[in-house]
Amino acid sequence: MSELITGQYLSEFINRFQLQLPQPDNVLTHSHYFSATNRRAAVLIPIICRPEPTLLLTRRADHLRKHAGQVAFPGGKADPDDQSLISTALREAEEEVAIPASVVHVLGKLAPLNSSSGYHVTPIVGLVPANIPFYGNDEEVAGLFEIPLHEALSLSRYHSLDIHREGINHRVYLSWYENQFIWGLTATIIRHLAQQVSI
């Protein structure tokens, strides 16, 4: 894609995303975010503003207790000191991939999803300048990779699989990019983003 086309593509993506933002959740008090019965988390969907824009993804370290070795966006559970779920996503991104919160231009958020580990996860979409160096925290991240945004947002990349677990039917989505296998919550988040900006 030429630089002109990719510049237009990113502009169109931003316009479509902001025109179709999900309705906000009911207003929650700060304490409600951290109640024992309402486990909340957030991830950052970092869009790197290269001539050909990309999505930044991580592969989680193999020694982690949950979701070891899986492809994921930087993110994690909300802390009591976080002012909002946007703050959660930005803090976690800085901890995991060294993207300073101050450089991220937040476009908005997607509707929250429930994870298999019992968290209510809110994806936050943010633009990151291409000249910002980023790298993985060795304690949490085994590697980083980028997917061209126009490829990530192609709905044909995502294949559904119906599974039955603990008496409940679940539909999960699978996708591949080069040698990276993307599935579960991460694939679902990207697919939701693609659906939101598609015409």
Curated annotation (Swiss-Prot):
Highest taxon of the source? Bacteria
**What SUPFAM superfamilies does the database record attribute to this sequence?**
Nudix (SSF55811)
Q: According to the UniProt entry, where does the motif Nudix box sit in this chain? A: 76-98
Molecular function per GO: coenzyme A diphosphatase activity; magnesium ion binding; manganese ion binding
The keyword Magnesium belongs to this UniProt entry's keyword annotation: yes
Q: Which positions bind Mg(2+)?
A: 92, 96
Swiss-Prot/TrEMBL cofactor(s):
Mn(2+); Mg(2+)
Coiled-coil residues: none
The record's annotation in InterPro entries points to: CoAse, NUDIX_hydrolase-like_dom_sf, NUDIX_hydrolase_dom, NUDIX_hydrolase_NudL_CS, Nudix_NudL
Name the Gene Ontology biological process terms: nucleoside diphosphate metabolic process
Domain spans labelled Nudix hydrolase: 38-169
| Role | Probably mediates the hydrolysis of some nucleoside diphosphate derivatives.
HAMAP family on file: Nudix_NudL (MF_01592)
Give the family, as the similarity comment puts it.
Belongs to the Nudix hydrolase family. PCD1 subfamily.
Tell me what this protein is called. Uncharacterized Nudix hydrolase NudL
Q: Which organism is it from?
A: Yersinia pestis
Gene name tied to this protein: nudL
